[in-house]
């Protein structure tokens, strides 16, 4: 993967994790309004709703973002080692 693709997928992964983490969990998450906790319609999918796909998608995006960040750090380390070969050596 080239540098542009690594950066792009890293940003997509980070933004996707932020979006999944910021998503409201439903009417029960609103504690300011007592009537908001009442069910207004039946659940869309009775076997867990959209929570499982959101969690799995968020984990996949998080793994993708971490992999891209590790790739960026690996490439940065190689460039620093090539430019400054004596920077990591300590004098006794």
Curated annotation (Swiss-Prot):
Membrane-crossing residue ranges in chain numbering: 50-70
Cytoplasmic domain ranges by topology: 71-92
Keyword Amino-acid biosynthesis: no
Phenotype on disruption: Knockout mutant significantly impairs plaque and syncytia formation and decreases virus production.
Alphabetically ordered keywords of this record: Glycoprotein, Host endoplasmic reticulum, Host endosome, Host Golgi apparatus, Host membrane, Membrane, Signal, Transmembrane, Transmembrane helix
Record membrane topology: Single-pass type I membrane protein
GO cellular component terms, semicolon-separated: host cell endoplasmic reticulum membrane; host cell endosome membrane; host cell Golgi membrane; membrane
Signal peptide residues on this chain, from the entry's feature table: 1-22
Glycosylation sites: 33
Location(s), subcellular: Host Golgi apparatus membrane; Host endoplasmic reticulum membrane; Host endosome membrane
Membrane-side (Extracellular) residue stretches: 23-49
Family to which the UniProt record says this protein belongs: Belongs to the alphaherpesvirinae glycoprotein J family.
Role of this protein: Functions as an activator of viral protein expression and virus production. In turn, promotes cell-to-cell spread as well as syncytia formation.
Stated name of the protein: Envelope glycoprotein J
Organism: Human herpesvirus 2 (strain HG52)
């Amino acid at each position: 993967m080239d540098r542009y693709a690594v950066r792009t997928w890293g940003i997509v992964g980070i933004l996707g994790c932020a979006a999944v983490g910021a998503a409201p969990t439903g009417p029960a998450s609103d504690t300011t309004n007592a009537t908001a906790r009442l069910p207004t319609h039946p659940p869309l999918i009775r076997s867990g709703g959209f929570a499982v796909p959101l969690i799995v998608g968020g984990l996949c995006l998080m793994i993708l973002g971490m992999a891209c960040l590790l790739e960026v750090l690996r490439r940065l380390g190689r460039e620093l080692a090539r430019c400054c070969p004596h920077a990591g050596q300590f004098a006794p």
